[in-house]
Amino acid sequence: MSMHGKFFPSLIGILLFFWSMPFLMADIVVRFPTENTALLDNRPQDFYMYVDRNFEGKKSQPWEAGAYGFTRTLVRTQAGPVAVKFHEGIDIKPLRRDASGTPLDDVHPVAGGTVVHASANPTHSNYGRYVVIEHQLADGPLYSLYAHLASVSCKEGDRVGTGNVIGKLGYSGVGLNKTRAHVHLELCLKLQDDFENWYSSLKLGTPNRHGAYNGLNLAGFDPAPALMQCKDGAEFSLSRHISSLPVQYVVRAPSTGSLPNLVKRYPFLLKPGPANPKSWEISFTGTGVPVSVTPSDQPCTEPSVIRAVPHPFSQLYRTCNRVSGSS
């Protein structure tokens, strides 16, 4: 393949690892956060909230755009129309509304855990009002995020279970209206503990009001497979699920002489290799979820992309603009 191997600054934050010890807890059964379980009945059109699309003069309301992945913003390429905008989560439709069309659905945690962030000011994030819950699993911490809430009924530090209400489904945040009200759900790995220092180095001119639970610091994977497991009461294994995700590109980063902190948080990511590596090779999905970390005896002075899966169009379209080049 032909590619520049350029490593974009936004990805460098993923490689800034900080101390966090794993917690030895049990796996969980992931539950749906609202009464809408249409996905279990093979009715995705009744589960995912559509977006209003106008592509080349043709208007549509595809429910697929409410699913996880590269599902939004079509562009025409030599390979045909390609959705290039990443949607880091799933948008779940409401089931109940009052006479004015305002949704009435309660939002519950997908599993028991601790509220680590509750942002009740809708102007502080594109998420609008949102809540983040930490779930301690055998493989390390899992984070669930619930966004665009009409109201928040929990606070940081609360211990919650699936029977608790953490908020109301709504349409707070950017680009939403009452008709398209939904709850945006993410399941995530946390990338850094000292996110604030990295964020400050970007000099974006806007304060980080969300600490380590800013969306930039949470690498979200598709929640749908985890939700589908609950039909049979199957437990969700974080390590098994992450290990099954497809790798899109691999980054080599210099070793600092100690185990990367991401590996300390998620030990299952570590693969066999030299005991005293000169660098680390981190495999990522196209959406930026780390899948594995492998010790390497190859020296390097700065992070760089060393491999990427070929595509018939720009790598930018399948790596959230993190990797340049094409196949």
Positions of the model-derived regions?
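A structural signal for short beta-strand/turn segments enriched in small hydrophobics and glycine
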Residues: 113-115, 157-169
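Active-site region of chymotrypsin-like
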Residues: 87-90, 94-98, 129-155, 193-195, ...
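Acidic, glycine-rich catalytic/binding loops that coordinate metals and/or anionic ligands
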Residues: 28-69, 155, 161, 180, ...
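Zn2+-dependent peptidoglycan hydrolase active-site motif and core
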Residues: 102-104, 108-151, 178-180, 184
